[in-house]
């Protein structure tokens, strides 16, 4: 069975062959929250030109060699920049990484960016990217810090990656840090004060729907 999607999360996929429309940018990730953040940002006018030129996919949709080969043939072969973000070492998705390295080797104008979701693997993964290792490390840390603003910066980096990563402005590589605790949707209002305590990680992943509904009811 084939499924054609723009942004694909894990839908208990085991055997489906995933393909997506051709685009300049491909983002493959181990982290479902990445897809949530990017999907929301692509709704903004700032990324109108990118909206139909990026495909995102949860790595769990590419479990077998058949799925990886099919996605490479039908989608990745038409891309100019592929960003892979994984939790684990090179062996976590060994066949997939091997095929991406082969894809990039065929055409040196293609850009492959491999990012780590953890600190301990960030150097070993960034150094096999086809771009400058330090820039790959910087982008890796940007995404690991989380939050809409850091993902906004990541999306702004993409067009520069396509041409020359050394042209990326510092403003898009500087991490935005969020205070802890972070006051989300806190307003100076009349009446009794009620605070909802939630995990900061949910805010950084933009999983705020429950909190917004609670705030609406309390107000």
Model-identified regions with their sequence ranges:
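An N-terminal assembly and electron-transfer interface module characteristic of large anaerobic redox
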Residues: 1-219
